């Protein structure tokens, strides 16, 4: 209803101003600004909804602000371009419509009415309401009744007798199991669900609506609210360090806790969370690649579900035979938005909906088949009688190709339990939420029936039952939950450990590299990883007077304040203000001590603008002083005009990438020497090894042969035509996820370049 009211007010404002208000520059600017705000808010809502499926929520702040790189960003380029073009067109059209009767005399009453209607349209819009609620949740002091509802359970389970298998199905919400809405979509896993305790009304709350948040909620009984934004949890050394979570209780009770997934464990800090709370045995894409039968059988996120669940079954067999008490958690990935992936062993590879194939539904049908096969193996084993199997979604599906059909249904998360010791078949329609999952499992295992804000759905009363406004209540508790991190509020001295690549201050530890915004009563960490924006781009968003401490590789800050370190890959520390003074210090000891030194200086806006502009230079446009092309730092020597076909810098150098160009092309600003030696330090990937690799300068071509290890080769060139471009053509680029960014399409690697140097020959 509010959407219709908001749009009606917007339309009325446009029509009244366009036809009645007349000419007045101030009223035109004010009305256009407010109407433009309405458009921006609604486009923001649309864009956020595209990513999250739930509008502007905490997942937008946590996952999208600084982490599109790890979200399969290529899938969203076209929608992003469409939004920008649409916004430009709408603003242009608005301005044209409002000025249609600009030659008519100004009418104060109609101008005021149009402006008030425009303000009303903004106030009534769902986007404004959602943003207002988010802002309030960031600034509240908390709710006095939090302590009454947050309960810490006993740290142990007396006399535990059951092993636990807990399966997180990526985005595998219960809605998919509605056979009337989606016939024969989930027959195998749906049949198993109907054999156990099926909790049919598991609500999704703020702070539980993306993978790591769903894991925290289900194991600790609290939403994931943190004193920082972005994927900073990937950078911290501990995760809710004061809280008692399910993994802690299991470990204290004699369980060995295992976690197996196909993606990289570092994504969003899952490794940090699990290690902080009782899990000593973690297996992700890096750990599995030396174990699985086919390490090259991967999707954009990691290993396919059939591979992961096969490894989980092997681990279940091994642990069961050992006789030790254990928990085995696993997380699937094939149903990840926006399209999902199909394991090659599935019988169900295709699902049609509305008369055409649907990739997301197909991925769901395939993944549930794999999960069901895993469960059936456990059920058929002699160890099932000592096992509790839990299947849950980590969160509701985000905007995938099935999302519009899901939204027509009553959506709930999946949570069901199959007990080997005590078969129970029942559908429980009690109102509950993800935070109740851990408490319910704890209750079944013989522990307490509460965990944080979670309550057992078998013997307790969920917060979703107690509070009709549970979403608003959860946001009201946000400051109380943030305080559970015990996060430092000041930074005066710090220590950098080069062996561990860590920085420590005020009792907290963070992985490097790291950017920190430091104010009087708050220290905000902003990390960099494969899944977040580069720190220099994050620093470019700082205000002129914001105090910062930036710890990174020296070459990344050298172009601004330390050109002598332009080729150094050592650690450096920069601190200051973008509009004031900055210092750069080289970290020259294994354990390096530093102090913050922020001076209250006069802000120079010209200096600020220059710093911001330099920080925003993209990697390929950076230039440094050197007599050779060094590939393990960003940019190129000053003599290079442009280059293509080359991937991002890595610690050793860069790969050629045929996804970016079939050949490596380096164009220099001036013609290459008439006679020169080309000294190439490089290696080959896969089948490119031991094969002739053409290297061309103008009309002359030489042959380069490389192995799988780095070697240096010198080629002799004559350049009578004054050519200015060097071309290297890898013979057989290989499509691979080796060293790839999680969630990105495979690269096509040919040769790995460490250094290329042009040496002029006399004569």
Swiss-Prot record:
Keywords: Cell inner membrane, Cell membrane, Membrane, Transferase, Transmembrane, Transmembrane helix. One of its GO terms (cellular component) is plasma membrane. Its EC number is 2.7.8.20. Disulfide bonds: none annotated. One of its GO terms (molecular function) is phosphatidylglycerol-membrane-oligosaccharide glycerophosphotransferase activity. GO terms for biological process: glucan biosynthetic process. It is found in: Cell inner membrane. It catalyses: a phosphatidylglycerol + a membrane-derived-oligosaccharide D-glucose = a 1,2-diacyl-sn-glycerol + a membrane-derived-oligosaccharide 6-(glycerophospho)-D-glucose. It is a multi-pass membrane protein. Pathway: Glycan metabolism; osmoregulated periplasmic glucan (OPG) biosynthesis. InterPro entries: Alkaline_phosphatase_core_sf, DUF7024, OpgB, OpgB/LTA_synthase_biosynth, Sulfatase_N. The chain crosses the membrane at residues 1-21, 26-46, 77-97, 108-128. It comes from the Bacteria. Its main location: membrane. Transfers a phosphoglycerol residue from phosphatidylglycerol to the membrane-bound nascent glucan backbones. Belongs to the OpgB family. This is Phosphoglycerol transferase I. It comes from Escherichia coli O9:H4 (strain HS). The lineage of its organism: Bacteria, Pseudomonadati, Pseudomonadota, Gammaproteobacteria, Enterobacterales. The gene is mdoB.
């Amino acid at each position: 209803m509010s959407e219709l009211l908001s749009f009606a007010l917007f339309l009325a404002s446009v029509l009244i101003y366009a036809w009645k208000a007349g000419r007045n520059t101030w009223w035109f600017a004010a009305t256009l600004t407010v109407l433009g705000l309405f458009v921006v808010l609604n486009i923001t809502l649309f864009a956020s909804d595209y990513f999250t499926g739930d509008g502007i929520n905490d997942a937008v702040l946590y996952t999208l602000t600084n982490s599109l790189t790890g979200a399969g960003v290529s899938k969203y380029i076209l929608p992003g371009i469409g939004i920008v073009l649409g916004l430009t067109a709408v603003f242009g059209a608005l301005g044209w419509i409002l000025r249609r009767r600009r030659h008519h005399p100004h009418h104060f009453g109609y101008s005021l009415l149009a402006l008030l209607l425009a303000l009303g349209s903004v106030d009534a819009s769902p986007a404004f309401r959602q943003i207002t609620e988010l802002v309030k949740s960031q600034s509240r002091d908390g709710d006095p009744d939090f302590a009454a509802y947050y309960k810490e359970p006993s740290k142990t389970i007396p006399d535990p007798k059951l092993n636990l298998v807990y399966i997180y199905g990526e985005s595998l919400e219960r809605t998919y199991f509605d056979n009337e809405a989606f016939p024969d979509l989930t027959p195998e896993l749906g049949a198993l669900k109907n054999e156990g305790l099926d909790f049919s009304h598991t609500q999704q709350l703020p702070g539980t609506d993306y993978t790591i948040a769903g894991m925290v909620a289900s194991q600790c009984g609290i939403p994931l609210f943190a004193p920082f934004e972005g994927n900073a949890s990937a950078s911290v050394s501990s995760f809710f360090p004061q809280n008692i979570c399910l993994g802690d209780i299991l470990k204290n009770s004699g369980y060995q806790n295992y976690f197996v997934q196909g993606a990289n464990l570092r994504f969003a800090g899952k490794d940090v969370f699990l290690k902080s709370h009782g899990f000593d045995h973690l297996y992700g894409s890096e750990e599995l690649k030396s174990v699985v039968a086919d390490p090259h059988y991967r999707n954009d996120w990691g290993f396919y579900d059939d591979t992961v669940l096969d490894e989980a079954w092997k681990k279940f067999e091994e642990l069961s035979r050992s006789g030790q008490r254990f928990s085995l958690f696993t997380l699937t990935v094939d149903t990840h938005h926006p399209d999902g992936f199909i394991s090659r062993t599935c019988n169900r590879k295709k699902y049609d909906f509305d008369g055409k194939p649907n990739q997301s539904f197909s991925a769901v049908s395939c993944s549930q088949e794999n999960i069901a096969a895993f469960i059936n193996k456990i059920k058929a084993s002699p160890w099932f009688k000592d096992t509790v199997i839990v299947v849950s979604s980590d969160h509701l599906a985000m905007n995938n190709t099935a999302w519009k059909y899901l939204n027509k249904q009553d959506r709930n998360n999946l949570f069901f339990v199959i007990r080997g010791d005590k078969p129970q078949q029942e559908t429980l329609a009690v109102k509950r939420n993800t935070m109740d999952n851990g408490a319910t499992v704890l209750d079944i295992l013989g522990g307490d029936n509460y965990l944080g804000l979670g309550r057992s759905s078998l013997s307790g009363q969920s917060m979703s039952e107690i509070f009709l406004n549970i979403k608003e209540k959860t946001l009201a508790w946000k400051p109380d939950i943030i305080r559970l991190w015990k996060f430092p509020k000041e930074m005066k001295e710090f220590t950098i450990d080069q062996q561990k690549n860590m920085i420590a201050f005020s009792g907290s530890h963070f992985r490097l590299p790291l950017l920190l915004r430091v104010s009087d009563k708050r220290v905000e960490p902003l990390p960099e990883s494969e899944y977040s924006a580069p720190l220099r781009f994050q620093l470019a968003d700082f205000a002129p007077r914001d105090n910062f401490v930036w710890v990174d590789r020296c070459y990344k800050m050298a172009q601004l304040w330390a050109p002598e370190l332009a080729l150094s890959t050592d650690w450096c520390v920069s601190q200051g203000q973008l509009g004031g003074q900055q210092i750069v210090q080289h970290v020259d000891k294994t354990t390096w001590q530093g102090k913050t030194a922020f001076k209250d200086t006069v802000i120079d806006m010209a200096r600020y603008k220059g710093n911001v502009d330099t920080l925003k230079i993209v990697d390929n446009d950076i230039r440094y002083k050197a007599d050779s092309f060094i590939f393990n730092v960003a940019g190129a020597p000053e003599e290079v005009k442009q280059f293509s076909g080359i991937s991002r810098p890595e610690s050793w150098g860069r790969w050629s990438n045929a996804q970016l160009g079939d050949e490596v092309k380096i164009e220099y600003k001036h013609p290459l020497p008439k006679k020169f030696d080309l000294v190439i330090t490089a290696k080959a990937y896969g089948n490119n090894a031991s094969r002739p690799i053409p290297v061309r300068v103008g009309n002359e071509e030489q042959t380069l042969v490389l192995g799988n290890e780095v070697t240096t080769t010198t080629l002799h060139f004559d350049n009578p035509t004054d050519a200015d471009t060097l071309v290297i053509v890898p013979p057989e680029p290989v499509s691979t996820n080796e060293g790839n960014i999680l969630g990105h399409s495979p690269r096509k690697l040919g040769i790995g370049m460490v250094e290329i140097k042009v040496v002029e020959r006399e004569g």
